[in-house]
Amino acid sequence: MSSISLNVLDDSVLIKPISEEKQGGIVLPSSAEKKPTKGEVIAIGEGSRNSSGERVTLTVKAGDKVFYRQWAGTEIEHNDEKLIVMKESDILAVIK
C-alpha cells in the first residue's frame, strides 16, 4: 500500500488505479487507452451522516482491491501519483 497523506472527507474514497498488463507489445496513445476500472483503496472518509446526524461508516477499507465505474470520480495528482477521489457508491465490487 502507498504512503499517501491525504485526509479524505465524508463518504469519499481515494483510489489508486491499477492498470491492466498490456499483451502483444502494441503501444496505444493515452487517448485511445481504456480507463482503468480496477484499483486499490488508499484512504476513506469518516462516512456520510444519516437524517439523524449519525455517521454511516463506509463498507470498503484501505487496502481493498475494487472495481469501479469507468468514469467515476475526479482524477488528482499527488506526489507524482495519479489518484481518483470518488464516492463509495461508485464502487461496484470488492475483489476477495
From Swiss-Prot:
Alphabetically ordered keywords of this record: Chaperone, Cytoplasm
GO molecular function ontology, one term from the record: unfolded protein binding
Cellular component GO terms, alphabetical: cytoplasm
Keyword Ribosomal protein in annotation: no
Domain of life: Bacteria
Example GO BP: chaperone cofactor-dependent protein refolding
Pfam families attached to this UniProt entry: Cpn10
Record carries keyword Phosphoprotein: no
SMART domains with a match to the protein in the record: Cpn10
InterPro entries per the UniProt record, alphabetical: Chaperonin_GroES, Chaperonin_GroES_sf, GroES-like_sf
SUPFAM superfamilies from the UniProt entry: GroES-like (SSF50129)
Location relative to the cell: Cytoplasm
CDD domains for the chain: cpn10
Subunit and partners: Heptamer of 7 subunits arranged in a ring. Interacts with the chaperonin GroEL.
Function of the protein: Together with the chaperonin GroEL, plays an essential role in assisting protein folding. The GroEL-GroES system forms a nano-cage that allows encapsulation of the non-native substrate proteins and provides a physical environment optimized to promote and accelerate protein folding. GroES binds to the apical surface of the GroEL ring, thereby capping the opening of the GroEL channel.
Family assignment from sequence similarity: Belongs to the GroES chaperonin family.
Listed name of the protein: Co-chaperonin GroES
The species this protein was found in: Wolbachia sp. subsp. Drosophila simulans (strain wRi)
